[in-house]
Amino acid sequence: LDQRGIADRFLSQGQVAQVAGFAWIPLDISDFPTRHNYGLALRQNHIERILAEWVADLGVPIHRGRAVTGFTQDDAGVGVELSDGASLPAEYLVGCDGGRSLVRKAAGIEFPGWDPTTSHLIAEVELAEEPEWGLRRDAHGIHSLSRPEAGGAVRVLVTEPHPGRSGEPTLRDLGEALVATYGTDYGVHSPTWISRFTDMARQAASYRRGRVLLAGDAAHVHYPAGGQGLNVGVQDAVNLGWKLAQVVGRTSPESLLDTYHAERHPVAARVLRTTMAQVALLRTDDRTDALREFTSELLGMDEPRRRLAAEMSGLGVHYDLGEGHPLLGRRVPDLDLVTANAPLRVFTLLHDARPVLLNLGEPGGFDITPWADRVQLIDAKYVGTLELPAIGAIPAPTAVLIRPDGYVAWVGDRTQVGLADALTTWFGPPTAA
């Protein structure tokens, strides 16, 4: 969000908090070498509203109240069928329509994984009786009753006694789960919303089928631990967006889209494994309690904590772009630079989603004229230690090629070997003189 210049919109409405954790074991990230070494507590509906406002600022239309009912595709494009009988022509279709994705099913993309072993209800409601506030762990699972805002609705989290129910949850379902756990439903009434989630873990076998791609929950579902689902979905979009724009804009070949699956599928596969591990640690028998205590001791040590916290926060993502400098395939740090004109932050250079060749060596040492219509060339100096959240201090390079998603596509260490190939691979062939 900071890379696009909109982080302040979220910071002004959220609450800085220590929200990183593994199976509810806190993971402190305050010593991470990043500008935002903390979590931000902000409800999802607020996040959606802020993003919708930004989309409106960019002049992108959102067609609400119209559902996709099907599509056809051929070599020329996609025809999207809508619930009002209309159809939309498009070059590509990206299914971001959740775990029950119609787009994924219609594309014939398999969704293998693991069935649920536990089921939870979460809701905002009113209670007629004073409840047992706070967190509760018992043989059924983990439950909590809280009032996040003074005078506001009660937030309920309760484990259902029998997993496997499907469909939209009802007030009756919630009442039955409360009775099973607390012996009473506390006179629950007036729900603002009720939602069900499970520990089902599934991932699309492929993120692309022809001109159809998947992102977010349509591509992967898992237990909602540590906010990873939202983070991974946003990172899917950030990875895919600029690639799709270049292909549609005819600056890159269609094969660039294949790198989306190659990069993002392993990331989500790892998230599925870590969330399954967390569910196992949240079980409430004595043996699991012993394992949880042992895990908590391990995560109290700096090295295991830093490694897992980087993974849980998304700051440790590393795309396999080959061997080389430790920065290759990792997110570029938001360095404070000195340029001929003024001080500058690296993330400021990414606000308009254009790639950047950042030259930290002698000014004028690079000529990228054949890509100048697509890639910014910035001569700058950086004084200080270069550190990454996942791996610590690393050698400072003389130049880095930064993709629009903030990940490093090439690193120069007093050499330009491989730069032209990287420019062509990621940003299309050179423009003829």
Give the predicted meaning of each segment:
Residues 1-303, 378:
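Core Rossmann-like FAD-binding/catalytic domain of the broad FAD-dependent monooxygenase superfamily
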Residues 24-29, 34, 49-58, 73, ...:
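Helical substrate-recognition/capping region of FAD-dependent monooxygenase/halogenase enzymes
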